[in-house]
A protein has these predicted regions:
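Classical Sec-dependent N-terminal signal peptides that target proteins to the secretory pathway
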Residues: 2-21
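Low-complexity, Ser/Thr/Pro/Gly-enriched N-terminal "stalk/linker" regions
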Residues: 22-109
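Structural helix-adjacent loops and short alpha-helical linkers that scaffold large soluble proteins
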Residues: 65-72, 121-133
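Residue-level detector of alpha-helical secondary structure
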Residues: 75-79, 113, 117, 138
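A generic secondary-structure boundary signal that marks alpha-helix termini
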Residues: 85, 123-124, 141
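Well-ordered alpha-helical segments within folded domains of soluble proteins
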Residues: 107-120, 129-133
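Helix-terminus loop motifs that line ligand-binding clefts
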Residues: 127-152
């Protein structure tokens, strides 16, 4: 018998000799103390949101009606509009900048990925459509400056 097998066998036997019988009385089901009964929005106040889309707000209301899990509905309400609320800088012109985080080398990829969930709603909201076009135009503008760069 090689050393590895002998070692594994001795560990298994040692563990088996120290095992105690487990009975149902060893387990107590406790009430979940992490349950939140009153879910509050974590979104910025409406006046402090960087971009507001009526189509996105309507989509949030629609999805929340479909979800039966209150916590999941709360998470969707807070997460889905987060990019618009906190990272999109659009001043009505054909130029939109999206804050993408700390990896500047991935701006082209991340700026597109962050606004991608809203593309499906673009035809329902002219302002949203213009903002999305602004992201694309900003990307083209940056690529024209340096086609081999990926961070601007």
């Amino acid at each position: 018998m090689n050393i590895t097998k002998a070692f594994c066998l001795s560990i298994a036997l040692l563990g088996a000799s120290n095992m105690q019988a487990i009975t149902n009385s060893d387990f107590v089901i406790q009430q979940d103390n992490t349950k939140i009964n009153n879910y509050q929005t974590n979104r910025p106040e409406a006046s402090k949101r960087l971009f507001v889309s009526q189509a996105v707000e309507q989509q949030i209301a629609h999805i929340k009606q479909l979800l039966t899990n209150v916590r999941l509905a709360w998470m969707f309400e807070n997460c889905f509009p987060n990019t618009l609320d906190t990272t999109v800088h659009f001043d009505g012109k054909d130029d939109t900048f999206v804050y993408t985080g700390d990896i500047h080398a991935m701006w082209l990829r991340d700026s597109g990925a962050q606004v991608w969930p809203y593309v499906q709603l673009a035809n329902k909201d002219a302002k949203l459509k213009k903002m999305l076009a602004g992201v694309i135009k900003r990307q083209f503008k940056c690529i024209n400056i340096d086609p081999y760069a990926n961070a601007f």
